[in-house]
Amino acid sequence: MSFNFSRYSGAYTTTFSFLLLALLIVSAVLLSRPYAPALLHAEEAYCVSMSCVTAAASVLSLMDATADPCSDFYQYACGGWVRANPIPDTKSMWGTFVKLEQQNQLVIKNVLEQPMSEFKSEAERKAKLYYMSCLDVNDTIETLGPKPMLDLLVKIGGWNITGNFSIKNWSLQKSLETLQNRYNMGGLFTWAVGEDDRDSKKHIIQIDQGGLTLPTRDNYLNETMDDKVLSAYLEYMTKIGVLLGGEEKNVRTQMKAVIEFETELAKIMSPQEDRRDEEKLYNNMELDKVQGRPPFINWHAFFSNAMENITRKISKKEKVVVYAPEYLEKLNDIIRNYTNTTDGKIILNNYLVWQTVRSMTSYLSKAFRDAYKGLRKALVGSEGGEKPWRYCVTDTNNVIGFAIGAMFVREAFHGNSKPAAENMINQIRTAFKSNLKNLKWMDAETRRAAEKKADAISDMIGFPDYILNPEELDKKYKDLEIKEDEYFENNLRVNKYNLKSNLEKLDQPVNKTRWGMTPPTVNAYYTPTKNQIVFPAGILQAPFYDIGHPKSMNYGAMGVVMGHELTHAFDDQGREYDQNGNLHKWWNNQTIEAFKKRTQCVVDQYSNYTVDNKHVNGKQTLGENIADNGGLKAAYHAYLEWEQRNPRELPLPGLNFSHKQLFFLSFAQVWCSASTDEAIKLQLEKDPHAPPKFRVIGPLSNLQEFSTEFRCPLGSKMNPVHKCEVW
């Protein structure tokens, strides 16, 4: 018997009775509506456990029973949520994912605020110190003001904006080596060590386009639409320059020139929608061959300088992958024009140093952080301003997330979630494979290879085991020094630690158990070079997964997430990688053409969706849309298979929905959300995902079983005559 049983049993009864009454009232309203489902369970028992009652109440509270499910299922499933959940002033987007993230943040906050003696490892104590440095418990950040940045500017050679710069001895080569290879900052291009697409057991240096401050190239090129953003960007740059000692008029003039330079970069970048063919992007060449094409720097000297971090030599014959050779060639022409004059060189240095300054201002005093509010408002429609502890929890998770993960898992992750999730994944994999036999557009040989690839997909669930071993966890962060009163310096050290850790992978075989997300993350991912799907502990919670919920709800929410990630192995990019994660052609030509024809249907379908008269980019979102559609179908068929093998679950009280209908409602309600106009615009320009509404109505309108369950007439919006089907 629990010590506090009598106290809580009374609360349980009261809450239960209240929810049951609420259900009866709301269900009466629901059944009075013209589009309510037929009475399905008139004379049978209902599930009246606490989990079932709360689940039913949640489903009802999110719905808009006045909407027609056959016209707009998103409104039907989520209209109540949207009505009851205005976007908080500090947010640009508000929805199920964000709410769950905030719950996870609270768990982490409570753990981080424990005394040092409660932590299990040195890594966890470092996380606590970092969190305290972010919160600035001793007012060190405010006392120091701009000093940490001014000290850094001296170390990296000065900045003309603040007047402590001489062009006399400046060189682009030296500046890039200092900023990128010592401080891990950005500018002009990006590079990193990653898995080799064509030989996924090995690591290789990868070079790509990059170097913009604003989120998309469109922000620079669509001047009419983005004039507000560009004006806010210039204002932000000017404020930062003045805070660092520059004279306002002079700072504004010089920063305008930096924006013009960034605009030149934006013009030569390929849009994301044109970078979806991995075969075409991959260009493996020796380092000296890179030198022959865009010689604005000495590439061998640059990477030799980088390798000094790990005392490794690099040959001119070292193989690297260049994903944007045309960009580098065009960049060479731009650099040549700017380095021909003294003013041009000053602009180049101003740009490069700005890339460092803007990435570090959030670690300075409040005046610097406030300077960003105007630009944030222009970009996403909100100035931000969340509580410091929330910001610092997120920041600490980004920096030392596997130590945070150990605390989170001990506090909030239930052990039985892992085997249950594993079982669900296997059922969805089986359903996906079974469906391959029905695909008449796929030849037999490619189908057999696809089945082998599906079987070979590995999964990681919850968290990596090593994080609960203090000695192993400490090894990961042993080279990272964290001090309580050095927030700015902590982040300089984090940058160097991350750079060194990345470089050290170069001569190591690929570790297929390395996680790319921290355990508290509310998300999931697929890695094509590992042929692997990963589901962190953070998402294996209600409303995505709850052991007390009916299987229909768990398959509809978490099951579709699992099916989505699995289907990424066969989207327009994932399909180019074989079962071992290697990029090569393993499909029959005729099957490739049939696949492209079917994916064009998806491109056209989503390109016809609009938000505020702006079209969804069907090409840019193709991979995610394929995964959404395939994931829904695989999860639904897996649920049907589960339903056939198991005793029938009791219906939820007050709903009069079948469990098949509950599956679709649970799927849709995961995406209940609202965004500012600015955030939607940015999403349409940048995000590979379609807006939430279309992630619901797109896949459902393509799945005949949905229309059958909700009795949608052929030709209605949710049951179009012409449907798209890939997997």
From Swiss-Prot:
Residues 46-727 form the Peptidase M13 domain. It is a single-pass type II membrane protein. Its main location: membrane. GO terms for biological process: protein processing. Keywords: Cell membrane, Disulfide bond, Glycoprotein, Hydrolase, Membrane, Metal-binding, Metalloprotease, Protease, Signal-anchor, Transmembrane, Transmembrane helix, Zinc. Glycans are attached at residues 138, 160, 164, 169, 222, 309, 337, 340, 511, 589, 608, 656. Its cofactor is Zn(2+). GO terms for cellular component: plasma membrane. Belongs to the peptidase M13 family. This is Endothelin-converting enzyme homolog. The lineage of its organism: Eukaryota, Metazoa, Ecdysozoa, Arthropoda, Hexapoda.
